[in-house]
């Protein structure tokens, strides 16, 4: 899997091929791995544990245990963890505390917030999407969380060619605009 903080997307990759894209939400506090920060960590990780087999997609979890309460998407009120939990383990020095920080890929009832940073460090997904992803992957699945666009990766470009050519064109236009800005304003830092 490749997660883009810029795009607020998760791209599922199976056998080296991009399969499906999901809209997600990363942390509203930013990116990083500092303990107690509520940041979304960057880098290489893997799914250490999967929790939620067989429960309804809106099942509320507290401390990774089902409460018996089931919420519909966009239910008013609080924002608990729902549906499924994929607990992440960092594989690099800078994100080695990811498991201890309890950073998950999980469902949210606040689906209207997907596509914008809204979490407290986890990677949030829609209720149906998190069940779909959960069913497609196993423990040990690789996850790469990156700051940049999915289109900066081979997998993202391949997915866009097949499913969203306009996405490729928009990305190319942004790259051209950035280059033009740098040429016309050489003292301005790179965007």
Sequence positions of predicted segments:
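A structural motif detector for short, solvent-exposed N-terminal "entry" segments of globular domains
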Residues: 1-30
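Structural motif
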Residues: 7-9, 44, 85
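Well-ordered beta-strand positions in beta-sheet-rich domains
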Residues: 21-23, 44, 102, 142
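An N-terminal domain-start capping segment
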Residues: 1, 6, 52-58
